[in-house]
Each structure stands twice: as structure tokens, then as C-alpha cells.
């Protein structure tokens, strides 16, 4: 849940106006909006590169995934793997915009481990694909930008384990 929504809900639950500290937090959140949107734009514009390079890293590290019997064996299954990676990158962009991990949690994580287990997909391979995307994505960023983006990649990786 974004800082703004949390502040509204907290104030409303107590039937009060915003406190000065809450207003200062909202001001800071709004001041960082341009930076967050710039990061999301960069990730969005480079999504194909991020996903393809990350998939190549994953498949080199885990050749069992693309070998006969692997979950990404064959053109259709590889495309499904790339689609899932793109989906998780998109969730990360939602969270960056929100300034909060709630979109990852509410849209993408609930029940995902069980789903992958039921499909016979090794969840550690999914986590590894997200680690690879983190590496590729952050290699294109400044140290300051990495700190912002790392938070969401790390949250998603942790949720997959």
C-alpha cells in the first residue's frame, strides 16, 4: 500500500486531519516521484533486453531447465518462461511507481509458489531468473538508482523462496 493511501487510511481511522509528520512524508514521496517514474521508464524501455539477457544467464547457469524434460524445454515452454520473467519485471515497475512492495505482494506473489509446484517448476529457478533480471537491470543504472530498484527485486526474490 502506498504511503499516501496508508496516510489517508490512518488519518481516517482516527477521524483526524493529517499530522505534520505525515504531510512531510507525503511531500518527500511526491518529491521522489520523478525519479521513480524515470526508473520505471528505463526498465520499460529496456524490458526485452533485460528479459533476454537474464534468460540467457539463467539457461547457462541452469541448463537442466532447457534440456529435454526441463520446464523451459522447447520453443513454447521457453516463451512461457520469458513471459513469466516479463510479468515479474512489470510487477517490479508497479511497485517502484507505488513506492511500496504491495503490488508485488497482492498481484504476483500470493499463491505463486503453490502454482509453480503444481506445474513441477522449480521455484528456485524462478527466483534465479529474478536475480538475473536484477543483475542485468541494475547494471544499467547508477548506484543511487540501484538502491531504489534493488529493494523490489530483493522483495520478490525473497517471496519466491
Swiss-Prot record:
Membrane topology: Peripheral membrane protein
GO cellular component term, pick one: plasma membrane-derived thylakoid membrane
Family: Belongs to the phycobiliprotein family.
GO BP annotations listed: photosynthesis
Function statement: Light-harvesting photosynthetic bile pigment-protein from the phycobiliprotein complex. Allophycocyanin has a maximum absorption at approximately 650 to 653 nanometers.
Subcellular location: Cellular thylakoid membrane
Gene: apcA2
UniProt source species: Nostoc sp. (strain PCC 7120 / SAG 25.82 / UTEX 2576)
InterPro entries, alphabetized: Globin-like_sf, Phycobilisome_asu/bsu, Phycobilisome_asu/bsu_sf
Subunit-structure text: Heterohexamer of two alpha chains, one alpha-B chain and three beta chains.
Protein name in UniProt: Putative allophycocyanin subunit alpha 2
Post-translational modification (record): Contains one covalently linked phycocyanobilin chromophore. The chromophore is added by phycocyanobilin lyase CpcS 1.
Residues bearing PTM N4-methylasparagine: 71
Binding, (2R,3E)-phycocyanobilin: 81
Pfam families recorded: Phycobilisome
Keywords per UniProt: Antenna complex, Bile pigment, Chromophore, Electron transport, Membrane, Methylation, Photosynthesis, Phycobilisome, Thylakoid, Transport
